[in-house]
Amino acid sequence: MNGTISKVISDKGFGFIQGEDGQEYFMHRSAVRDGSVFEQLREGQTVVFDGGRGDKGLRAENVRVS
């Protein structure tokens, strides 16, 4: 699924993605395919990811920069 980074809290290692389906997905740094890219993610940046559901709601998996 395509999405846009809506918030990144790099010092805490997570952020949020607004999916093309209108839902907001939690993104942990471990979900970014190339972990070193996490530090370079910026709000408004377009990404591709797999949507999933975790214990606390929607989660982004396999996040990659498009």
Explain the meaning of each model-derived region.
Residues 35-48:
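Short nucleic-acid-contacting surface segments enriched for D/E, G, S/T with interspersed K/R
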Residues 23-31:
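A short macromolecule-binding patch
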Residues 1-11:
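Structural detector for short beta-strands of small beta-barrel domains
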Residues 3, 44, 60:
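Residue-level signature of catalytic and energy-coupling elements of molecular machines
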Residues 12-17:
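Short aromatic-glycine-enriched beta-strand elements
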Residues 52-66:
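OB-fold/S1-family single-stranded nucleic acid-binding modules
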